[in-house]
Curated annotation (Swiss-Prot):
It comes from Syntrophus aciditrophicus (strain SB). Residues 2-78 form the GIY-YIG domain. CDD domains: GIY-YIG_UPF0213. This is UPF0213 protein SYNAS_10430. InterPro entries: GIY-YIG_endonuc (IPR000305), GIY-YIG_endonuc_sf (IPR035901), UPF0213_domain (IPR050190). SUPFAM superfamilies: GIY-YIG endonuclease.
């Protein structure tokens, strides 16, 4: 069973970006390099990992990513604040 991660990044302009990956170290490096990162984060580097959750299945990680993306900024900040151990 592979590990799947949903994550929240804080961009240099203080906006938040949510995504998922199977290799968080590699994905964070990609976001910060600008070469393979998301279009959104390319112009907002550097990015910093502020929240990370491990999810057992691909379907589960996609559902969790969708849940987080639907949250308001305030809700995302509360999630980050309430779960410092998820870092």
């Amino acid at each position: 069973m592979s590990k799947n991660y949903v994550y929240i990044l804080e961009c240099s302009d203080k906006t938040l970006y949510t995504g998922w990956t199977v290799n968080i170290e590699k994905r964070l490096q990609e976001h910060n390099s600008g070469k393979y990162g998301a279009k959104y984060t390319k112009s907002r580097r550097p990015v910093k990992l502020v929240h990370l959750e491990m999810v057992d299945s691909l379907s589960g990680v996609l559902k969790r990513e969708a849940q987080i993306k639907k949250m308001s900024r305030a809700e995302k900040l509360q999630l980050i604040k309430q779960n410092p151990e998820r870092m």
